[in-house]
Amino acid sequence: MGIKGLTKLLAEHAPGAAVRRRVEDYRGRVVAIDTSLSIYQFLIVVGRKGTEVLTNEAGEVTSHLQGMLNRTVRILEAGIKPVFVFDGEPPDMKKKELAKRSLKRDGSSEDLNRAIEVGDEDLIEKFSKRTVKVTKKHNEDCKRLLSLMGVPVVQAPGEAEAQCAALCENHKVFAIASEDMDSLTFGARRFLRHLTDLSFKRSPVTEFEVSKVLEELGLTMDQFIDLCILSGCDYCENIRGIGGQRALKLIRQHGYIEEVVQNLSQTRYSVPEDWPYQEVRALFKEPNVCTDIPDFLWTPPDEEGLINFLAAENNFSPDRVVKSVEKIKAANDKFSLGRGKLLAPVANLTGSTSTAGKEPKCILGGPGQVMKARSPLQVCKSSSLNFIHDNSKAFMLGRRSGFLRISTYASI
């Protein structure tokens, strides 16, 4: 869900914080991608007709694999260096929201059964989508696919969008791509919406910079976090009757939630009992993420592994898999493999237009250096992780408590 009404609020009160861009403007850039919503979208959209979905011979759904393959190929062909970040354990405060979603799915399942009984195809289509749930297997399938494609994968210890924001804050990536606006609340320096659109054509990419958001709203980061909590987020109830517009006015007037609560009309508004806004504030400011992160590395696709996984195990057309591999290789040859480079913003991006008539100052980073050949077996170490590399694979030897896991293609 993210932050209720934040997109509309920023469009009205911070229009200069959003910049329309082309996908090509991010050529050569390293972008962290929040995968959680993407996989859900694939399961809903790709190959679905009513209750019928794409499956392999074992009856297992493969829509997520088809969607992830196609989208990743298009991202690579655009010259973008993606790093896919997966959700870890949700914070305790989010479990109530997840329980609500589960109950809603259960209700949709009952509605779906009734729609099937009466043969209402429109309702079948509607309710079948509402019953979709992303499972651990869906996530593991996508991690395996991405690793075979030679693309870095990060398993976050907590929320993926929080980990993406940490990667951006620590200059491991140029920007993060997600549809959840709470990426800004977690402090993402540069946040992209619509970058991972299935077609790349439906909407231009919208780029937000948190510094410009704060400047135009006239708030500090702490006040912006309180604004988001008041507006409504995934981690606690908000005060009924207070939406984004009212929340912004109150924060500008009183500064922080404590002062807002003290000055609220007790007859008009009812503050939730034991409202954990302080814990939610701490979660946004200090989420469960890792900051000691090795450099990312992109490698050639494992053609044999992809054919075995997609064609042999999941009944994809072998010819289609080979064509996808050829596209990945062509993109890698064109933009080069290796480590991504991030350059400081110093010049305009070609073809970019600001919604406020101003253009941000940035330049495109050059492609990463071509990866040197590895020895057949190489042990790499960091302060927290050990990896063994055997050309294209890496196996973790150990990790500290609470540390994230990085896939095969994270170079140290």
Swiss-Prot record:
| Cofactor(s) the protein needs | Mg(2+)
Judging by the UniProt lineage, the source's domain of life is: Eukaryota
The record's keywords, sorted A to Z, are:
DNA damage, DNA repair, DNA replication, Endonuclease, Exonuclease, Hydrolase, Magnesium, Metal-binding, Mitochondrion, Nuclease, Nucleus, Phosphoprotein
From the Swiss-Prot or TrEMBL record, state where the protein is found.
Nucleus, Nucleolus; Nucleus, Nucleoplasm; Mitochondrion
Recorded hits in Pfam families, A to Z, give: XPG_I, XPG_N
The cofactor note reads: Binds 2 magnesium ions per subunit. They probably participate in the reaction catalyzed by the enzyme. May bind an additional third magnesium ion after substrate binding.
Residues that bind DNA? R71, E159, G232, D234
Please list where the region (I-domain) is annotated.
123-254
Gene Ontology CC entries for this record: mitochondrion; nucleolus; nucleoplasm
The entry's Mg(2+) 2-binding residues are D180, D182, D234
Choose any GO biological process term that the UniProt entry carries and state it. Answer: base-excision repair
Do you know which Gene3D superfamilies this protein is assigned to? 5' to 3' exonuclease, C-terminal subdomain (1.10.150.20), 5'-nuclease (3.40.50.1010)
Q: Which EC number(s) does the record attach to this protein?
A: 3.1.-.-
Family, similarity comment: Belongs to the XPG/RAD2 endonuclease family. FEN1 subfamily.
Name of this chain's protein: Flap endonuclease 1-B
Q: Which organism is it from?
A: Oryza sativa subsp. japonica (Rice)
The record lists the lineage as: Eukaryota, Viridiplantae, Streptophyta, Embryophyta, Tracheophyta
